[in-house]
């Protein structure tokens, strides 16, 4: 069973520019993510998908393989699934797990649990969203990535860490867009 762990890291984040290179716990966020994936039991290969040479250099320094993301997949409005499919096309595997480095306090055990559940159920997503694992078969047959089906097996794990990196402006934008549609807001 070959497991590819990935980090998708754009330099051009509009919400928090250079976010993936900013220091967290003394390391660039992308570097910390690579270290977390390296500490898992089940991830065999670590790939960072990016359009940025700066992020690519840091990723290589931390021992990850870099996959250049085409500009068409490096836009704000592109869902994650096409990016995952691009990774799997270039790095064949049985299971792909993406580590969302917006949640940098995630423990390696959460990533391993997502992989185990994906093997059992084809797709698993941690709550909070730190690890999203899918079998290669599931990714190849995902359907419309712009309107993904809600088939992922959701599992709560306090080791995912409640931290999510955003700006105040970003959070206010989400609040305005969802106002009246989210319970408790």
Which stretches of residues belong to each language-model region?
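N-terminal nucleotide-binding beta1-loop-alpha1 segment
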Residues: 1-17
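Conserved acidic residues
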Residues: 3-4, 44, 94, 122-124
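Short beta-strand/turn micro-motifs composed of small residues
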Residues: 9, 50-51, 100
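Short glycine-enriched, charge-decorated loop/helix-capping segments at active-site entrances
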Residues: 19-24, 72-73
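A short, N-terminal amphipathic alpha-helix
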Residues: 29-46
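Short phosphate-binding loop-to-helix
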Residues: 47, 53-97, 105-110
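Short beta-strand scaffold positions
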Residues: 49-50, 165
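Conserved core of the sugar-phosphate nucleotidyltransferase
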Residues: 77-86, 95, 100-185
